[in-house]
Amino acid sequence: MRMNKRTLLFVSLVSAAFLGCQIFFGYQDLKSCQDLAEKQRAISEQILASTEQLSVVPWTASAEESESVNQYAVRLGNRLLVLTKGGAHSEVHSKGTSWKLIDQTSTFGGILVSLYGEDGQEVLSKGGSVYLPNQQDALPVLVAEFRRNQEPLVFFGEYKNGKLSNKAGTIYGTSLVFLNTGNEFVPLGIYNSKEECVESLDLPMARAVVFADKENLTTSGSYYMLANEYMQVIVSQESGAIEGINLPFASDREGNKSIVNEIGFDRELAAGSPSEASFPGVQAIDSQRQNVSSVVGGYYPLLRRGTLSDTRKMVSPQYQALNIVSGRELSSPVATGFRVVSFDNKTLVLESGDGGIRKTYTLGEQPYAFDLEIQTTRGQEDLWITSGVPEVEIMSNAFVPAVKYHAVKKNKSDLINVKLPKAKDSLLVRNDASPQWILNSNGYFGVILTPKTPLPTGYASSFIPGNAVPTRLTQLSPKDQAYPASKYPGYTAMLPLPKEAGRYQFMVYAGPLSEPTLKALDRAHTNHKGESPEYVDAIAFRGFFSFITEPFAALLFIIMKFFQFLTGSWGISIILLTIVLKLVLYPLNAWSIRSMRRMQKLSPYIQDIQQKYKREPKRAQMEIMALYKVNKVNPITGCLPLIIQIPFLIAMFDLLKSSFLLRGASFIPGWIDNLTAPDVLFSWETPIWFIGKEFHLLPILLGIVMFAQQKISAIKRSGPVSDQQRQQEAMGTMMALLFTFMFYNFPSGLNIYWLSSMLLGVIQQWATNKILDEKHLQHEVIVNKKR
């Protein structure tokens, strides 16, 4: 019996201890729950206070009914979302305002979600279609959790793989889930806490949200395409930057406004490497969420894309255009794994996975231009925006990349050339300049970045090895290494971003450096003070003698544009330009020819003087000079026409490098298809040293004409040929050969100009010689009276 009492006492004590623990820990749990609830309520109130568009409000079914504390709705601007069981009211009231039913939809468990508005009219999201991210990314959302007899809690959560989570605790109640598109909140769906899944809402405000299905599931490797009549802009979801900018070729097709002509490289790539000439080049999605069909040819790739047939050799995201980079070499992207917030036919909005960066691409009205807005939610130092790497253009057989910026110094604007960095010092950073805009150019095309909001001072440029950003030209005769990647390095231009969080806007021009389009851009961006950004300065090609040739080049182009307007042909305009210059210079040329003719007539007398005074060279020189003087001959005058034409020749050379309108301009189809490239009469497979794989006829014709001119300029000789005359003939022949080799790989436009000039010179030489022969010029020689 005593044993039983002890056992009973022990059991009682254990039970009391257990009950005490239960009460103690229950109290602790209750206190923790109360603390958590208070914390959640405080967070909810803080979020609602900072979110003007979204709020939680009580509602009633009639105006006479007092607002119940357990009936709450979510207000989005002038719309109201109400959760009920059973039927929906045709009208509800909240805070003295009547709300009329717009639409309703049934969800799980008989829950009805009703949409009300003050005017009762339907409304769609302004942001276009909103795409959910791929299944691997978490989407930040705003959640309104409805709990029984309590005001809904509002907190930030994450949506992933159809699931909803809250870092602060478990979600127990039915919840409305909202997506912030930047301009507004749109309903993403309703959360079923029992099944732990989000279901879509069939409501006008929510129909703009598109749930990714299995057939159209986007991945982190997705690309999105914005397009108009001037360009395709291909944006990578992985980097949030531009993978490619493709410019359509000019054609007679209705609606085509492009001024970009197809050239030989484009045709060769389309025929020999169609995979490298495909556009958009990657599997892209348009604003209708349809896959964009790939085509071969028809576009010019402004940016280097690498080798499309080998993903290992495609351009790395760090070198894509309008990327935001940082790091020691300014080559590390600060954000990856972007998601599409909204997407329509003009605007694409992307947000980084961590929500730190939002980028908005908007196609503009101006040709080859679009806008970019970058929104950063937290400050960070040393952020830079990149220009991308332009594709290679061969200008007059040369690779001429350039980085320039436009700035105002001492109330005077100027376009300043940036010294390109080398492989050893691959990064150039300058903090002492304030560019109004910066240009990264390949000669005929360029990317211009213009900040529309204030930025820190400075700019940067970097050298990128050609193997890291291979040009498309490497696919032309790869066995022969006609265009090795290492020979064509890439360059980027960069502008700094402020370290403070905020919105920063840019105007981006990505297209031809053409006078018509850049002038139109200048007019569109001239401010109320009449100040122009002077984008047209970007087409200036500054050679070694630009201070001399620039006025001549401007004059030549004005005359050429006039003749092109009359004839419709740039080739004919070059020939007519040559005729005009010959007419203007005719008096000087005629005087020079007559002077040279007299020099030739004086040659026998000069030889006599040299023979007579061969032991007195000073005396012979004096007699020869006296002979020149009495016959009014200056030995230098024969060179004047050539000297005068040199500035025009160099100006024409520079003009062909700077005038985009001549690029791809055809003169004789099948032979002269591009005035800025050598003519091609025929070609072959195996390259020959210096000649290459193409036969250029124009420089050979030029050499023949120069040789003929030298023969025509020589007078008929009755006596033996002197050593000096033999040397002159040999020199003339060598000059003809030299010009043939020198001009062999020059642009056909330059060869047409020089060939036309030589032909007209031959005609003038022949006519002048004939006239002088008829006048018996040999009797006009006056011999010194004293020898």
Swiss-Prot record:
State the similarity comment: Belongs to the OXA1/ALB3/YidC family. Type 1 subfamily.
Major localization listed first in the record, in broad terms: membrane
Which Pfam families has this protein been placed in? 60KD_IMP
Q: In UniProt terms, what function does this protein have?
A: Required for the insertion and/or proper folding and/or complex formation of integral membrane proteins into the membrane. Involved in integration of membrane proteins that insert both dependently and independently of the Sec translocase complex, as well as at least some lipoproteins. Aids folding of multispanning membrane proteins.
Q: Quaternary arrangement and interactors, per the entry?
A: Interacts with the Sec translocase complex via SecD. Specifically interacts with transmembrane segments of nascent integral membrane proteins during membrane integration.
The protein's gene is named yidC
Source organism of the structure: Chlamydia muridarum (strain MoPn / Nigg)
Upper lineage is: Bacteria, Pseudomonadati, Chlamydiota, Chlamydiia, Chlamydiales
Lipid modification (N-palmitoyl cysteine), residues: C21
As recorded in UniProt, coiled-coil segments are none
Q: Where found in the cell?
A: Cell inner membrane
- Matching InterPro entries, A to Z? Membr_insert_YidC, YidC/ALB3/OXA1/COX18, YidC/Oxa/ALB_C, YidC_ALB_C, YidC_periplasmic_sf
Q: How does it sit in the membrane?
A: Multi-pass membrane protein
Q: Which UniProt keywords apply?
A: Cell inner membrane, Cell membrane, Chaperone, Lipoprotein, Membrane, Palmitate, Protein transport, Signal, Transmembrane, Transmembrane helix, Transport
Molecular functions per Gene Ontology: membrane insertase activity
Tell me the domain of life.
Bacteria
Residues annotated for lipidation of the kind S-diacylglycerol cysteine are: C21
The molecule here is called: Membrane protein insertase YidC
HAMAP family reported in the protein's UniProt record: YidC_type1
Q: Which residues form the signal peptide?
A: 1-20
- Record bears the keyword Cytoplasm: no
